[in-house]
Amino acid sequence: DVVTTGECRIVHKDFCDILLCTKAYFEEKEVGFYKKMQHTGYLRHLLVRRAVKTGEILLDLITTTQIGVEEEKELLAGWLERLLALPLEGKMAGILHTKNDSLADAVKDEGTEVLYGKDYFFEELLGLKFRISPFSFFQTNSLGAEVLYEKTREYVGETKGKVVFDLYSGTGTIAQILAPVAEKVVGVEIVK
């Protein structure tokens, strides 16, 4: 299913501008969306991440491999040109292309190519700087996360001379935020 909007109050305007530009470009080129019941089509997902504090933007276009290599190269070059011409408030850190022929509707990385810039961006939380890739588990609302983590510090209480365990630590944001005020912090995460 294709869900689109020209305006959304819960995301930065750059998200909508990128979405509308991408949608218009591929419609002009008559490139179809992926139809999961028929397993046909090219465009699967558009992942857009934007750092609140740094303003850096990372894009990842997830597609099938249902068009030829040369046609795809030309198609993506045109899309890249359009994106880089957009008057965004943020700074484009990277534009990626991920291939995914999986039958599942989830984004599965079956090969990612950097089309522009780098495959990560930086965000800051409570004075700490985090490097975030397209598939990193990281809070999408950085300002809300800061409030949440401040509350976590309050609940944890006095940590001087104590070892703190951050279970299900993900990228380790809570562990890193508690590290300066504890003797030792251990982050535990299972990655399969």
Q: Predicted regions span which residues?
A:
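Accessory RNA-recognition modules of RNA-modification enzymes
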Residues: 1-192
